[in-house]
């Protein structure tokens, strides 16, 4: 199937390790856009962050934020979940681990809880979820722990974003570097993992870049453009 759009993670995929945007990734994104291939930014960050990043980087596709819980396109926002059990979990975590911290972005979030991974282990979070019998999942993005409803993920976000573009998810190629990109891999037509990605993501990829971080993201975009006849 012909690839008509590229969805791509932000942190670690089009950035340096310190999260600064990588100029080579920026050039690759703009090259794809110039060829008529819309880029969809897909991130665990807030919808406000994703919208701003899209404007500054120069992408034309929808943005998928909050790990799939929020979609924004042409000044229209859709939230696919709300938080209830997440706060029950957080109250319990705070009782047991007083030093645990959520992201400073929590006041802007509506679809999931984000816990700083240096303050608690993701396996511990999962154990507490099971103890409390909550209908939640915890995913380590490599930058933070994202806690959300089971149906909220990058894959479901890409499915919804594809509707805005009038294409099928299988007509999207996805590029990522984290565990939370696995759900995206399940719905798209072509999958690329950046070199520093965890083993499980690489095992499920159609292509693994030779370079890491933003250089790897740039390599991924050019690879997709060449493979599907745009270059």
Curated annotation (Swiss-Prot):
Q: What class of enzyme is it?
A: hydrolase
Which coenzymes or cofactors are required?
Mg(2+)
Ordered alphabetically, the record's keywords are: Carbohydrate metabolism, Hydrolase, Magnesium, Metal-binding
| Residues annotated for substrate binding in this entry | 154
**Residues the record lists as binding Mg(2+):** 9, 11, 177, 181
What CDD domains does the record point to? HAD_Pase
Spell out the catalytic residues: 9 (nucleophile), 11 (proton donor)
**GO cellular component terms listed in the entry, alphabetical order:** cytosol
Sample GO molecular function, one term: phosphoglycolate phosphatase activity
Q: What is its EC number?
A: 3.1.3.18
Question: Which reaction(s) does the protein catalyse, per the Swiss-Prot or TrEMBL entry?
Answer: 2-phosphoglycolate + H2O = glycolate + phosphate
Question: According to the lineage, what is the superkingdom?
Answer: Archaea
Short name of one Pfam family: Hydrolase_3
Tell me its family.
Belongs to the archaeal SPP-like hydrolase family.
**PANTHER family this protein is in?**
HAD SUPERFAMILY HYDROLASE-LIKE, TYPE 3 (PTHR10000:SF8), PHOSPHOSERINE PHOSPHATASE (PTHR10000)
Q: What does this protein do?
A: Catalyzes the dephosphorylation of 2-phosphoglycolate. Has phosphatase activity towards p-nitrophenylphosphate (in vitro).
**Assembly mode:** Homodimer.
Q: Could you identify this protein by its name?
A: Phosphoglycolate phosphatase
